[in-house]
């Protein structure tokens, strides 16, 4: 990952240089709290025995993984990605209602991590791309993330469908 791609003994050299030049760092829509998906598969043994990228079954290990990402990058200016997708940027495995509840649990945990690191006021983003669009809008049985007040201080990035067609538009 960029934050650890520095040469020699200083693995944070790239992040330090970016910070020196005033570059605000962030990660993609499927790399929460400064942690890349490939990092998880390379480092999961530091956090437990399961490599499952599944917050339902591996919450403790994934939370610690995110905590370490924030600890590593908190001295630099970042935009913190919130949310979670399935392995390799896929959809989550539950029903829409289950996944809405899961994402609310995930985002609450992520915001708690930021708060513990005095980063509650740091910029945060939730990207509403195709894997999470249904959870944004919700269903007849479960209110989506769109009206969830926990996200009032989070930038919501609305995306196209890879062909230039907007999937969701702002209402205000």
Language model: regions and residue ranges:
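Feature activates predominantly on carbohydrate-active enzymes
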Residues: 1-65, 74-80, 150, 155-158, ...
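Gly/Pro-rich turn-and-neighbor structural signature
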Residues: 59-172
